[in-house]
Every structure is written in structure tokens, then in C-alpha cells.
Swiss-Prot record:
It comes from Dictyostelium discoideum (Social amoeba). Residues 186-231 have a biased composition (Low complexity). Transmembrane segments: none annotated. This is Rho-related protein racD. SMART domains: RAB, RAN, RAS, RHO. Belongs to the small GTPase superfamily. Rho family. InterPro entries: P-loop_NTPase, Small_GTP-bd, Small_GTPase, Small_GTPase_Rho. GO terms for molecular function: GTP binding; GTPase activity; protein kinase binding. The keyword Kinase does not apply. Residues 232-254 have a biased composition (Basic and acidic residues). GTP binds at residues 15-22, 62-66, 120-123. One of its GO terms (cellular component) is cytoskeleton.
């Protein structure tokens, strides 16, 4: 039996452009892989989930990774419960930028907010064309061990690898994000000691299940809003927040 008041959990997804952030979110919310790559400015997605037998309004924010939006992007950061930082396992620069761009940007306004590190496009590790292109530039795919090491270095609460094309690992990411939002340390009083890094709570006595509703509906464009409540049982997808289509950058997603 479902009990309790619905809690809103805001998750913001960041990372370099074209690393697969939008594909990850679309696959999770619609169970369909997008055919075309269209650069994002901002989109948000609302999903009704269950955590520990309680309803959760999961609000997912998709952001632009391009430098053109460096001043606009942080406007989506207030009241964020969890950040998901993505990099492509076949784009080493996107891994390096986590330390030099994304983590510093987040810490300017949201230091201490739980972070989940995600390596995307794992299916391309076995793609001959991709491997050939990497070899030409004397590079190789980012290994899982490198991702694990970076997650520890930046204090991420979880690390995942996934493929939006195959669906491998996708659901686990968002289940972990909800858990991290519920288990993040409460705001301490001035007399309490505060830690420099956020980590999973150790007070949870047992793991909780996160379930996903599957009914979807669409809505028209509206200003960014992260806390719109919807009836139980509904899974809503909000589209069109400043979505930009750049013909020069349009290409098949991986």
C-alpha cells in the first residue's frame, strides 16, 4: 500500500556536449532511443517513481554542455538534490573536463550536493569504426578502472557505466539518484561538524526498492519548474524548454 506525501527529487544531468545525456534521459523516460542528435539548451522530464513504498516526483533536468551556455546553465542548479555528471567512454576529453570544468562549476553554487558519475556509450568500446578513429589519434577508450578512480577522486557517491543504445545500466543510475537524494546528510546546525564531501548515508538499515510507473503523457512548453505535482500513477514528459536544433551539429546519436 502506498503511503506518505509525495516528495520531489530534482536531478540535474551535466557533461560535455554530445556525450549522450539526452539519449540517456529519453531512453529512461520513454523506453525509446532517439534517432537524431539535436543539441539541447534545457529540457526537463517529470517521472512518478516509488521509493521505500512512497511516491516520488522525479524531476530530471537535461542541460547544454556547450561553452555557449556556460552563463545560462547554472540557472538550473538551485535546489538540486543530486547531480549526474556524464562522460563518454570513447571521448577522453569529456572525462578530463569533469575535474577541470564540471566539478568546479557545480561547487560554485552546490558544493556538498551528491554526485553520481556516469560513463556513457559503452557499446562503442566494441565498435570497429570508433576504435579505428581512436587509433588514428593514438587514443583508446576510457577504461572502467579509470572511471572508478575518478569517482573516488571527486567524491562521487556512485559510479556507473551505461549504454543508452542497449539500455544496459540505465535504470540503475536513476534508482541510485533517488536513493542518494533520500540519504544525503541533513543540514547541520552551526555547532555541528560538517564534512567536506557528500557520501551515502550509513544509517539506512536495509536497501529500498525503486519502481517506475510506465504511463506517459506530453505537455506543452513552459518555464522551468522543478516541483509540479502530478496525480499518482502518471509519468509525465515535459518537452521544449528552449530546445535548439543545429543543422550543422545534427548527426546520429550513439
Amino acid at each position: 500500500m502506498v503511503t506518505g506525501i509525495k516528495k520531489t527529487v530534482k536531478v540535474v544531468v551535466v557533461g560535455d556536449g554530445a556525450v549522450g545525456k539526452t539519449s540517456l534521459l529519453i531512453l529512461y523516460t520513454t523506453k525509446a532511443f532517439p534517432k537524431d542528435y539535436v543539441p539541447t539548451v534545457f529540457d526537463n522530464f517529470n517521472c512518478l517513481e516509488m521509493y521505500d513504498n512512497k511516491p516520488v516526483n522525479l524531476v530530471l533536468w537535461d542541460t547544454a554542455g556547450q561553452e555557449d551556455y556556460d552563463n545560462l546553465r547554472p540557472l538550473s542548479y538551485p535546489q538540486t538534490d543530486v547531480f549526474i555528471i556524464c562522460y563518454s567512454v570513447v571521448k577522453r576529453d569529456s572525462l578530463d573536463n569533469i575535474k577541470y570544468k564540471w566539478l568546479p562549476e557545480i561547487n560554485q553554487t552546490n558544493q556538498g550536493t551528491p554526485i553520481i558519475l556516469v560513463g556513457t556509450k559503452t557499446d562503442l568500446r566494441e565498435d570497429k569504426k570508433t576504435l579505428s578513429q581512436l587509433q588514428e589519434s593514438k587514443q583508446e577508450p576510457v577504461s572502467r578502472d579509470e572511471g572508478v578512480a575518478l569517482a573516488k577522486e571527486i567524491g562521487a557517491v556512485q559510479f556507473f557505466e551505461c549504454s543508452a543504445l542497449t539500455g544496459n545500466g540505465v535504470n540503475d543510475i536513476f534508482a541510485a539518484a533517488i536513493k542518494a537524494a533520500f540519504n544525503k546528510p541533513a543540514v547541520t546546525s552551526p555547532t555541528s561538524k560538517s564534512s567536506g564531501k557528500s557520501s551515502p548515508s550509513s544509517t539506512s538499515s536495509k536497501p529500498s526498492k525503486t519502481t517506475t510507473t510506465t504511463t506517459t503523457s506530453s505537455s506543452s512548453s513552459s518555464p522551468p519548474a522543478a516541483s509540479t505535482a502530478k496525480p499518482a500513477g502518471e509519468k509525465k514528459l515535459s518537452w521544449g524548454l528552449f530546445r535548439k536544433k543545429d543543422k550543422d551539429e545534427k548527426k546520429p546519436a550513439k
